[in-house]
Amino acid sequence: MQRTVLEVNHVFRDFKQGRVHAVQDLSFSIASGEILAIVGINGAGKTTTVKMCSTLLTPTSGSIRINGYDTVVHAEKARHGVGLVLGGDKGFYARSSVSANMRFFADVAGVSYHNQRSQIAQLLDRVGLGDKAKDKVYTLSRGQRQRLHVARALLGDPQLLLLDEPTVGLDPDAALQMRDLIRKTAAQNIGILLTSHSMQEVEELADRILIINSGKICVQGILSDIYHYAHISAVSTFSLPPSKSFEQLDICTWFADEARVLCRAAGTRWKFTVLWRKPQEQPKRRIYEIFREHVEESERAEQSDRSGLKSFEGEGSQSHSLFPSDIENRPMTLEDAFLAIAQDPTELS
């Protein structure tokens, strides 16, 4: 039976004597065995939220409860129920062995001496480091150190695990191993709070998703809830070479209220993603129509020597260099929904 391991109720967190509002009116919960992912642009408040849930920071107002214990009123009891994985190369005694590091942190976590050996061996096996117990920490790969961070955080049998960007900087194989470890950890009935910039990772792992921007919740729910909130009916992509006639921001505004258009540099070209707000039976044709309208209008205004563009006869018929030739339609992804909800309309990263 699932039970609530984390409750965040109307939490605010201010910095610089109240001049900076890092988190504003945040409320959510996590059940045992559930993975909740928090996503947002840099500075959205993700890491601040994780630190408050770990008791490293206290809320300016509101309350956070871990296993029913308030993180301010009963900080020590609340802290005992949570494991924090910040990751990175720091946090261990690099020239000591893996097992020596684990024994040290077992003492910190309050694991009794009689239980330390068995719990350490069990955790190292769980994270795939059972054969590395005698190795010095500095000899471990980055992915192995990240898994060691998870083993350390699980000392003392916490019911809640906090993972802040657990796969950042890892190669693809190490990232896959970490994701598999996260799934197996949740299967042990441990609630997990995850932050990540990888939308693919969030799609694969999260039971529920919470999108925040400027410290405020935009939307939370299962993947279909996020898609519904984004109000995207279809997605199209195309690219163009740099143009002396138009800036990329000009092109983004051509679609008005029909779509939100995002652009980024892709080598020597501009890559555009069109998030259609209104249903389109023929999105490719509509893109050509929009381009024809604005390009012809600009050329008329500049009194171009050309007599105009060839009439539109169908998709792919335009030969003008300002017309996209690689338009593709594809299914919506979480990244599309996230950008539609929380990202600046001119940036795609």
What are these regions (language model features)?
Residues M1-V8, F12-D25, A75:
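A short, flexible loop at the N-terminus of ABC-type nucleotide-binding domains that lies
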